[in-house]
């Protein structure tokens, strides 16, 4: 809502992040989002958005027992889960047995398929928007706006405005 973006992307910022309870402290905010990133709005084509979602799916693997987890290079020797993004409100599915570039089997926004040539706006942190995290589709020239406040300040202000409703509907599937 703040940026007017169609889609938002966020990362698992810390392997110690547990989310929030009913009562939230500043410590909880900092544990869940320890970086002083700012929120950006980025202009992308649907094809670029698909590549970004595809890249994120590439962090995952399915073992012989069918269990899905992170590829070792993202968790050993040091976890780097802050490079793995999840997206909302798009609905997406990825077949992890397929080769890179073919894993995304569904990518829709409000029930309609993402169109390759259509322009979409993505809300994402400035680290990612400038190309951080090995995502080749991001670059500074795609940034349309950057908010002055960092995430911690925005979370703190948002959480002090009363009860927060969280959409817990799962909008992704990896298989």
Specify the residue positions occupied by each region the protein language model found:
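Feature captures C-terminal
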Residues: 2-175
């Amino acid at each position: 809502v703040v940026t007017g973006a169609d889609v938002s992307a966020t990362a698992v910022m810390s392997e110690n992040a547990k989310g929030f309870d009913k009562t939230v402290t500043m410590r909880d905010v900092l544990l869940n989002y320890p970086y002083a990133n700012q929120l950006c709005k980025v202009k992308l084509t649907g094809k670029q958005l698909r590549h970004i979602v595809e890249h994120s799916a590439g962090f995952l693997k399915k073992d012989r027992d069918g269990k899905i987890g992170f590829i070792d290079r993202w968790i050993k020797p040091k976890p780097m889960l802050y490079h793995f993004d999840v997206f909302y409100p798009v609905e997406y599915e990825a077949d992890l047995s397929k080769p890179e570039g073919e894993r995304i089997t569904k990518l829709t926004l409000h029930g309609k398929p993402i169109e390759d040539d259509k322009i979409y706006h993505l809300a994402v942190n400035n680290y990612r928007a400038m190309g951080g995290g090995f995502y080749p589709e991001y670059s500074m020239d795609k940034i349309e706006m950057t908010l002055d406040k960092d995430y911690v300040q925005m979370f703190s202000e948002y959480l002090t405005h009363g009860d927060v409703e969280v959409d817990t509907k799962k909008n992704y599937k990896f298989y």
